[in-house]
Structure formats: C-alpha cells, structure tokens
A protein has these predicted regions:
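A structural signal for short, hydrophobic beta-strand segments that form beta-sheets
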Residues: 62-68, 99-108, 118
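A generic structural motif
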Residues: 69-75, 108-124
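Ser/Thr/Gly-rich low-complexity blocks that favor extended beta-strand/coil architectures
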Residues: 77-112
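Short glycine/acidic-rich loop motifs that flank beta-strands on beta-rich extracellular proteins
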Residues: 1, 5-6, 15-29, 38, ...
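Extracellular beta-strand/beta-solenoid scaffold signature
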Residues: 22-33, 57-62, 70-71, 126-134, ...
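Short "repeat-start/strand-capping" segments in structured domains, especially the N-termini
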Residues: 2-6, 38-41, 140-143, 161-166, ...
Length: 207
C-alpha cells in the first residue's frame, strides 16, 4: 500500500458562495487511509460538513466464519489479500495466536466471503471468530496535528491503527465522538482495525 503520505493546509468544506444552497461538502469521509504502509502526516487542515468521518485510518481485517479443512477457511471478503500474502491469525479479542500462514489459493465464496487455502495445516485453535490480518499492510505511525474538524456527520477522527499522535486539534459540533479509538467488525458491511497500540492524544480542544 501507499505510505509516507502528507496533507498540510488542505481544506474540505462548503463551496464559497454556495453555503446556503448545499450544506454537504462530501458524502463520505474527508480523509480515509486504509491498507497503507503507514507514516501519515495530517497538519494545519480544515475539514467540515462531511457526510461521514473527518479522518479514518485503519487496515481491513477478515473475520473467520468457517473451517473447510485443515488448510482452508472462509472469511468475510473485506480482507484485501492475494495469493502469496502472509496472514497473521488473531484471537477474537485481537490477542496474538502466534500463527501465520501464506495464502496459496483464493476464490469467492458467495457475495460477501472468500475461501482461502494456506501453505500449511492450521492448528485446531484457529476456528470461527478468529481475525485474519494481512501483514503486507500496516497503517501505523501517524501524526494528526493542528487541524480543525467541525460540523460533520459521524466522528472527527476515527483512529484504528497503532503508533499515533493526535495533538493540538480543535473539534466543534461533530455529530459523533470527536476522537474514537476502536476496532469495528460489522459482518457483511465492514471490518476495520487491527487493534490500537501506543496512541497519544494531547492538547486538543473540544467544543
């Protein structure tokens, strides 16, 4: 995935002169970074009137829904992966299992699932409810500073990756939480976040 991304002084807002006609700047997130190689810098920006979150940083994961045989599982298709990728298996609590395996086969399994075959037999502990993480992606290491998030639907910042610093931002009239730290799996809809570790939130203003 892309990495070393910098946004400095960007504005997402209502079109000047059209404020009384159109009250929506975007219908989705202002900035949505997923399945990247991390190192994301967002500073001195103004994000407002989005139809969803101001900033969302995460990697997609897969939810194991069934075991076919000792080397094959079915999971939600939100997991972006290809043959040759290394998958790390996590407990449903996101605790590590110590198990990794390389994908040797991938086919669709219905409209919202994929069937994955691996290069080795999986231990009996890898069962329904486990989380699949593609080690190729890691959106960690992000700096979000001195931005103004205001008057948007949903959250200001949705932080779902590790090694982040969120500092000096101002939040005004966000419909949801100004800063939400979460991992979120809605079966059949989305599966975002690999667990957040080492996140600092400091010197922000909430109104």
């Amino acid at each position: 995935g892309s990495g070393h991304i910098k946004l400095d002084g960007c504005v997402i807002g209502l079109r000047p002169g059209e404020e009384n006609k159109r009250r929506l700047s975007t219908q989705a997130d202002g900035v949505h970074c997923l399945n990247t190689s991390g190192h994301i810098w967002i500073e001195n920006c103004d994000f407002s009137f989005m139809g969803d979150d101001g900033t969302n940083i995460h990697d997609n994961v897969g939810l194991l829904t069934s075991n076919v045989d000792s080397k094959t599982v079915v999971c939600q298709s939100n997991l972006l992966c290809e043959v040759g990728d290394t998958i790390e298996f996590l407990e449903n609590s996101y605790a590590p299992t110590g198990v990794t395996a390389v994908i040797t086969g991938k086919i669709a399994a219905g409209s919202d699932s994929i069937r994955l075959t691996f290069d080795k037999e999986l231990p009996d502990s890898i069962q329904e409810g486990c989380i699949l993480k593609n080690t190729k992606y890691d959106s960690s290491y992000y700096y979000i500073a001195n931005n103004y998030y205001h008057e948007n639907r949903a959250r200001g910042i949705l932080a779902q990756a590790s090694q982040g610093l969120i500092t000096g931002n101002k939040f005004f009239r966000t419909q949801g939480a100004a800063i939400l730290v979460i991992t979120d799996i809605a079966q059949g809809l989305w599966s975002e976040g690999t667990g957040v570790d080492t996140l600092t939130v400091s010197s922000n203003t909430f109104e």
